[in-house]
Amino acid sequence: MADAGQQRPLTAFAPPPPLWKHFTPDNLKKLDEIKKNASKGEDGKPQKKKWTPTELRALDVPPELHFLVPPEIPKSGHYSVFGELQSLSTALPSLQDQGITQLYPSPPTGDADREQPSEPSQPLNHAYYLLKISKSLLLNFLEFVGILSVAPEQFESKVEDLRNLFINAHHLLNLYRPHQARESLILMMEEQLSRTREEIQQMDKLKEEITGALEQLKKDGVDVDAAPIEAPDNDTKKPNVSEEKAIEDTRLVWELLDENN
């Protein structure tokens, strides 16, 4: 764990955490033995069991096996990915919280609504400000090209302006994510409802076809309301006249259904 506190050089691909060195074949075998002993039943034989991370953490394991047990999932705070801290909160942080200059007005908050309850708050027009930022990007890029042709050493300020414009544009696009999620869910529910309605229509259509086939059989003199003939206990017994008639009626029903389809 001493290596974790040392500063590592930045690389294109982050190195694995130091704890991977504990995942040796011997340690894995020891952990399997501990799980087998803990899962023994009354007969003394190990039982097949799917261990949850909570159950594994409750086992009495030696210190060298602690890294093999999944840690508890954090519910708050931050985690590090490629050397950058990421928040566990799903809320989109504002640009001011990230120390970035915001080039568009912030949406009205609840405090502003309570101060002026008679005036309804106007929602932020994302498309309008996205268009303005896009035009500013084109203008700043032209200025950047001009600076490179006249005084290339003065490019840093213009690059910072372009970077700030891109960050603001991406942040505005990310504000659409909740709306995109709602619309995607609505679309999925509408597709599911449409499939259910199609299945119901197919069932109603099949019901009408069967009803029409039965009505046609009644017109032909076939007694479709008669009780079905139970199959004989002896499979080798030959069918009698009534059984043959029932089989023939069934065959006629299927032929009529095939003709309608």
UniProtKB/Swiss-Prot annotation:
Domain of life: Eukaryota
Compositional bias annotation for Basic and acidic residues: 23-46, 234-244
Coiled-coil annotated residue ranges, if any: none
Keywords, comma-separated and alphabetical: Activator, Nucleus, Transcription, Transcription regulation
Keyword Protein biosynthesis in record: no
Location relative to the cell: Nucleus
Family: Belongs to the Mediator complex subunit 7 family.
Biological role stated in the UniProt entry: Component of the Mediator complex, a coactivator involved in the regulated transcription of nearly all RNA polymerase II-dependent genes. Mediator functions as a bridge to convey information from gene-specific regulatory proteins to the basal RNA polymerase II transcription machinery. Mediator is recruited to promoters by direct interactions with regulatory proteins and serves as a scaffold for the assembly of a functional preinitiation complex with RNA polymerase II and the general transcription factors.
Protein name, per record: Mediator of RNA polymerase II transcription subunit 7
